[in-house]
């Protein structure tokens, strides 16, 4: 792997909820500290850097310091209310995906939902939050970890029961254009808009068509339902870079069905112009249960004793692409009736074809590349990589 995403403070898999400054009113960020990350996150990244010193890292917050939100709480949605609504929506025989329900302490009347700014829309808070990003960049740089790009908010439309923060596009436009954008440019750090989890191109239009915020945005990140906005945004803004920022999380079974879904997602994103495709999570314990009760898939499953691990089918799906498609490669358009494939040309001019077969029986397909013909037989329920040098 050549690029990865990290959280700015807590996310939904964090051992506990925290920010880098929970001292309310410290607008000068005098008590800013990444000490919490020195326990696990920083050593984890440094270990990855030991394997790949050229690993590129970008970051986004799930939540600002809680005192910067109107609710003064990390979460945006009450766990107990969500669990009650899920239970009421179930049909007979159905079960919820939440394996456990833990009260997150957010009063129901303090929820902030899509279409409302949960972040306090006042200049001192905007300035302090931009400074928070700046100090994060500096603190990680001091640890030998360069953050090359940031996105302002993970899933900015989603009111979650874990650390989260809803923003309107207008609120983010103001923050980017007047505060975060100038601060990151001064640091030499790129700024992308995202992460986009809605199929609503107007959200991106609001940011990019504003003269103040649009000048700072060099790309857009998409995940979940945001993938359906990608084709139109790619067509309207071809000058930008596009990232797939989070793999859809699965159900913790880590089976072929999950891998097949990942392959379908890869094809959609890569055929519609993304430059980067990323996974979530890299490694989890068996079952992959998040702190709030969702069993999720991972590339690696760690045994309960912590002494061994297993690569999952989705690890090999990722490897089919990432091991053979080099940075700087370009996707090649293909013709014909067989569409379960991706093709790339690497900087060294080698051609890589990744071909899938989700049928219950083997299938022979024929490729014609540069005048040569290849007719491999693809096993049932498989993904296959061919490299032509």
Regions found by a protein language model. Give the residues of each.
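Short, solvent-exposed loop/turn and secondary-structure capping segments
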Residues: 15-19, 68-72, 161-163, 232-236, ...
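Aromatic/acidic polysaccharide-binding cleft in carbohydrate-active enzymes
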Residues: 241-316, 334
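Folded extracytoplasmic luminal domains of secretory or organellar precursors
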Residues: 53, 148-151, 359-361
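Carbohydrate-binding surface patches
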Residues: 323, 334-370, 377, 381
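Active-site neighborhood of glycoside hydrolase catalytic domains
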Residues: 127-253
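N-terminal catalytic cores of secreted or lumenal carbohydrate-active enzymes
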Residues: 1-147, 178
């Amino acid at each position: 792997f050549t690029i990865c995403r990290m959280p700015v403070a807590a996310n939904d898999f964090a051992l506990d909820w925290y920010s880098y400054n929970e001292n309310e009113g410290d607008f000068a960020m005098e008590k800013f500290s990444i000490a919490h990350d020195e326990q696990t996150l920083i050593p984890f990244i440094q270990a990855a850097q030991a394997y790949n010193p050229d690993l590129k890292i970008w970051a986004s917050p799930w939540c600002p310091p809680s005192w910067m939100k109107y609710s003064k709480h990390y979460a945006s949605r009450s766990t107990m209310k969500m669990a009650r609504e899920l239970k009421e929506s179930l049909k007979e025989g159905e079960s919820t995906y939440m394996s456990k329900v833990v009260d997150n302490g957010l009063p129901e009347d303090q929820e902030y939902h899509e279409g409302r700014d949960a972040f306090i829309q006042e200049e001192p808070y905007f300035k302090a939050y931009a400074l928070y990003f700046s100090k994060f960049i500096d603190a990680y740089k001091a640890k030998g970890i360069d953050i090359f790009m940031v996105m302002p908010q993970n899933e900015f439309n989603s009111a979650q029961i874990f650390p989260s923060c809803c923003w309107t596009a207008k609120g983010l436009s103001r923050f980017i254009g007047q505060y975060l954008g100038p601060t990151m440019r001064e640091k030499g750090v790129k700024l992308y808009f995202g992460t986009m989890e809605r199929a609503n191109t107007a959200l991106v239009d609001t940011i990019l068509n504003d003269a103040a915020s649009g000048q700072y945005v060099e790309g857009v990140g998409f995940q979940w339902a945001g993938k359906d906005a990608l084709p139109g945004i790619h067509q309207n803004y071809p000058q930008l870079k596009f990232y797939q920022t989070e793999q859809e999380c699965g159900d913790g079974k880590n089976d072929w069905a999950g891998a097949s879904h990942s392959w379908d997602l890869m094809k959609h994103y890569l055929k519609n112009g993304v430059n980067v495709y990323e996974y979530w999570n890299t490694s989890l314990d068996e079952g992959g249960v998040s702190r709030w009760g969702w069993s999720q898939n991972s590339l690696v499953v760690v045994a309960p004793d912590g002494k061994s691990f297993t690569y999952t089918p989705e690890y090999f799906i990722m490897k089919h692409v990432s091991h053979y498609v080099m940075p700087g490669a370009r996707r090649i358009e293909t013709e014909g009736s067989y569409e379960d494939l991706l093709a790339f040309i690497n900087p060294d001019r080698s051609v890589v074809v990744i071909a899938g077969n989700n049928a219950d029986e083997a299938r022979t397909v024929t490729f014609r590349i540069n005048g040569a013909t290849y007719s491999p037989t693809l096993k049932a329920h498989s993904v296959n990589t061919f490299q032509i040098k």
